[in-house]
Amino acid sequence: VDALTKEDAALLLIGNFDPNAKGFASMIGTAGRHVCGAAGESCSTVKGIPWLIMADGPAGLRLAKEYYEDGKGKHAVGNASMPDSIMEMLSGPMKLVMSLMGGNGKPKAGCEIKTQYCTAIPIGTALAQSFDTDFVQQCGDIVGEEMEHFGVHLWLAPALNIHRSIRCGRNFEYYSEDPLVSGKMAAAMTRGVQAHKGCGTTIKHYAANNKEYNRTRNNSMVSERAMREIYLKGFGICVRESQPKAVMTSYNLLNGTHTAESRGLVMDILRAEFGYQ
């Protein structure tokens, strides 16, 4: 890493960017090239640095169920980012957008159709209602085994934001309104996944991400006491008990500052206080 040029080091931070790509190009969503349907991957053009493949999915890995290969790479059959049953209900413009993100889904004649069937584990809220960390760790073990099988390095989960309001559209992904339950469940899931060599979790969304509407621009105004007693506590538990391989900051601003740009949040609390490595 020390031998990298500044240009190569920068490439490692922006996904598998192709400067020659024409038209619609996404760095995240279903942008994986080596594993079809994976959310994204790091740049594979930097010599000596292998790519890092990331897969989304709150209830297990979300990959393209079927795909084919040709001289240009791997391509999903159907839409890699949206099930056909949901695509049928979308408007014409939305179908166009989703097809651009997920591919046209039509296999070429003569190409072999390959499969990537992943296990659907219970969603976060259901897992938390079990209060059974051993079971949650077993679910993580299932995900970790499939990560090894399909060649995925980072799972972009678990999400442990607090159930602050019933109106949040992603509450089902999150564990609980209780930060203790949230932290314990995320730690158990992480231990299960990371028992597999080369596999890691990405706990998210750090922090105070409790609404989906306008999530890239909304500003969470939270007191220090509320942050420490509610919104940060689960992350601290998870980091101390399982040391996840990655932490994803949230899109929202926190008290006027983007979370990824907050030294207090990322360095002082996450690293120095929680001990994240």
Regions found by a protein language model. Name each.
Residues 1-277:
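Glycoside hydrolase catalytic-domain context in secreted enzymes
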